[in-house]
Amino acid sequence: MRVPFSWLKAYVPELESPEVLEERLAGLGFETDRIERVFPIPRGVVFARVLEAHPIPGTRLKRLVLDAGRTVEVVSGAENARKGIGVALALPGTELPGLGQKVGERVIQGVRSFGMALSPRELGVGEYGGGLLEFPEDALPPGTPLSEAWPEEVVLDLEVTPNRPDALGLLGLARDLHALGYALVEPEAALKAEALPLPFALKVEDPEGAPHFTLGYAFGLRVAPSPLWMQRALFAAGMRPINNVVDVTNYVMLERAQPMHAFDLRFVGEGIAVRRAREGERLKTLDGVERTLHPEDLVIAGWRGEESFPLGLAGVMGGAESEVREDTEAIALEVACFDPVSIRKTARRHGLRTEASHRFERGVDPLGQVPAQRRALSLLQALAGARVAEALLEAGSPKPPEAIPFRPEYANRLLGTSYPEAEQIAILKRLGCRVEGEGPTYRVTPPSHRLDLRLEEDLVEEVARIQGYETIPLALPAFFPAPDNRGVEAPYRKEQRLREVLSGLGFQEVYTYSFMDPEDARRFRLDPPRLLLLNPLAPEKAALRTHLFPGLVRVLKENLDLDRPERALLFEVGRVFREREETHLAGLLFGEGVGLPWAKERLSGYFLLKGYLEALFARLGLAFRVEAQAFPFLHPGVSGRVLVEGEEVGFLGALHPEIAQELELPPVHLFELRLPLPDKPLAFQDPSRHPAAFRDLAVVVPAPTPYGEVEALVREAAGPYLESLALFDLYQGPPLPEGHKSLAFHLRFRHPKRTLRDEEVEEAVSRVAEALRARGFGLRGLDTP
C-alpha cells in the first residue's frame, strides 16, 4: 500500500518526517518496503487554460490556444484536448522526467507549437499516457509554475499484514499513530442534506453476500476535473484521477479502507438490487471487457418492471453502461459490506484484482458504511456542487463488536512485564476501545474497524505493540544439561549442508508462509489441500501448503512486479503437509545465464538448472539422474522425475506455459525434492593419477525425444570407463532436418589404474555410435579436442 506522507500528516499533524514515520510504523508492525520521492516537477512546467481547440484538417491533431500568462499555441493529439480545461504546459527548454529529453518549439502541420501539453506519464506523475492531465480551468492563475501547487511528495510503500484490513486506509494508520501519543485530526463530514424523497428503491436478495448495504442520493452534479490537491493525493497513492465524482469515491476508499461506487441514475431504472448472476448474463465492465457472468457471482443490478439487468460485479468492478460521465447529473452512491469469500471467488474467476476487491477480500468495517457515505457526500457537495438527500436506503443489521474480558494483571503475567494498569487501559482507549468496569477484570469493546480483536490475548498483544516490544524485559532461559541429540540433529545438519552448497552455487534462500491459497491448487494443477484452517489470517492463507514451488513462484512474481530483475536463482527448505508432514527442498530459476556472468554462451533454463543439481549432488557424493515423466504443472516437453541413488525424490522442469500465462510470468524452471535424501556410505577413493581422454559427440534426434533417453543410452553403451557425460549444446535449425534437434555431449573417459589407450577410447565411442544408430538417431560428427 502506498502511503503519501503529506496525506497521512493531514490526520496526524505532529508527524516529524518520513524517516520517523517509517520507524514508528515498523514498531507498530508495518514494514516499509521502500521510500520513494515522487513529483519532481520542473519549474518550466506551468498551468495553462485551454481557450480554444481546433481540429487540424486531415489529421487527428488539434491546435490549442492556451492562456499560460500569455497566449500561446500548441499542437496536441490527445482525444480529451478541449476548450474549458486546465492543462500542464511544458515550456520550450524544459527537461521532462517522463520523457528524458528537452521540450522544443517546433512547427507541426503548419502550426508553431510553443512547448507541449502533457499527459500524466510525460509529466512523470503517473503511468497513464492516453490523454492530457486535466485540471479545473480556474485551478491556478495561468502561467503559475505547477510545482508551486504540486510540490514533491514522499511515499512509503507499506506491507500491510492480512489481519489488519483497517490499515488499508490512511485513517487506520493514523489511529494506530494516535495510540502512540500523536494527536489525531478526524476528517469532517460537513454535510448539508435535504429532506427529499429518493427516486429509486433497494432490494437485497442475497443478505449473506451483502450483510450491510447502503445507497445515498446526490443530484445537481457538475462533473469536472478534480482539484489539484485531490489529484496529487490520488496519483501519489497509485491511482489515476478520472473526474471529481469518481475521484471522491476513490479518495474516501483510500482514506477509510471502504470501497464505494457511483451509478449514473439514468441507467439504474426503478432501483438497485443485490443478487446472484443469472446463467448466461453478460456485463461490460469498466475495463472495456465483455464478461459472461457465473451464477455464483454477486452482482449489483438495476430493474425496470420485470426486467433486471446487471450494473456491476459487486465489490470488484462496476459496469461501463452506468459509469459516471461528463453529462451525469444524479447518482446513486453504493457503500456496502460484502462477504469476503464471495468477492474473492468472483475476482479470481474473472481475473480481476482491483483496489476495491483487495479490501473487500480482507474485510471492511461492518459499521463503517454510513460514516463513509456522509464523508463522500460531503465531498461531492464541496467539489461537484451536489445537492444531497438526507435519507439513505439501508439493508441489513450489522452486528456490533462484543465486549472482551481484560485483566491487566494477566497481560503482565503473559508478557513478563509490569506495565501499570492505568497505562494499559489508556492504550486501549486511545485505540478506540470502550472500557467499562473497575477491575481487576474490565469489559473492553473494540472499535468496529478492528476485525482482528476477538480474544483477551489480542488485547494483550495490542498493549505490547503500543508500549513497544523492546520494552519487554529480556530473560535468559534456565540452564539445563544438553541432552544427546546426535540422532535428532543429523537431519538438520544435512539440511544445513544443502543450504551451504546451494548458496555457494549462487542460489538465494527465501522463506515463505506455510499457508497456501486453496485456489492455488487449481491454478497450479495440484491435488486439493487436505488441511484447511478454521480461522485463517486471510482467504489466501486458508490451507497448509502441499508443495513449496508455488511459494517460490509467488516470490518471483512479486519481485518482477516491483522492479523486474533480469535473473533469479532461489531455493527454500521447508515443511509441506500431505498425508503426513514432510520436509522438501525446492528451487527456481528465472533468466538465462544465471550465475554465469562470464559465460560466452547463455545456457537454457532447463539445462542450467539441471547442471546446478548435478553440481549439488556431486558435492554430496550422490548419484543423480533425470528421467522423462509428465507432471500436470510442468511443461509437457520439459519435465522429468529426479532420481537420487536410484530412488525417486522429486521433479525438475519448466512451469507449464498455461500457468505462466495466467500468472503473467515469463518462462520459469523449477525443481522440488523430498528430504531427507537417500543415504550412501561414504568411501574414500584415491583420485586417479592417470590422464583422462575426451571426446565430443553430437547426436541428431527427433525434437520430442527426451534428453534423458539419449543420456541413458550413451551411458549404457560407453562402458565402465566413462567418467562423466555433460551436455554442452542444444541446437535446432538449418542444416538439421525439420522437426529434429542436435544434442552435443562432452565425454570424459578415465581408467582408475592406468592410462587408457586410444583404441580403447575409440572402441567405446564406436559402441555408443552403434547404439545410437540402432535406435534411429544420427551423428553430426566425432571430434577429438
From Swiss-Prot:
Molecular function in Gene Ontology: ATP binding; magnesium ion binding; phenylalanine-tRNA ligase activity; tRNA binding
A single GO BP: phenylalanyl-tRNA aminoacylation
Matching Pfam families: B3_4, B5, FDX-ACB, tRNA_synthFbeta
Protein family (similarity comment): Belongs to the phenylalanyl-tRNA synthetase beta subunit family. Type 1 subfamily.
Occurrences of domain B5 (ranges): 399-474
Binding site for Mg(2+): D452, D458, E461, E462
Quaternary context: Tetramer of two alpha and two beta subunits.
Residue ranges the record marks as coiled coil: none
Protein location: Cytoplasm
A single GO cellular-component term on record: phenylalanine-tRNA ligase complex
Reaction it catalyzes: tRNA(Phe) + L-phenylalanine + ATP = L-phenylalanyl-tRNA(Phe) + AMP + diphosphate + H(+)
Classification via PANTHER family: PHENYLALANINE--TRNA LIGASE BETA SUBUNIT, PHENYLALANYL-TRNA SYNTHETASE BETA CHAIN AND LEUCINE-RICH REPEAT-CONTAINING PROTEIN 47
Entry's cofactor comment: Binds 2 magnesium ions per tetramer.
Domain tRNA-binding stretches: 39-147
SUPFAM superfamilies registered for this protein in UniProt: Anticodon-binding domain of PheRS (SSF54991), Class II aaRS and biotin synthetases (SSF55681), Nucleic acid-binding proteins (SSF50249), PheT/TilS domain (SSF56037), Putative DNA-binding domain (SSF46955)
Descriptive protein name: Phenylalanine--tRNA ligase beta subunit
Keyword terms of this UniProt record: Aminoacyl-tRNA synthetase, ATP-binding, Cytoplasm, Ligase, Magnesium, Metal-binding, Nucleotide-binding, Protein biosynthesis, RNA-binding, tRNA-binding
Cofactor: Mg(2+)
Subcellular location, principal: cytoplasm
Domain FDX-ACB: 688-780
EC number: 6.1.1.20
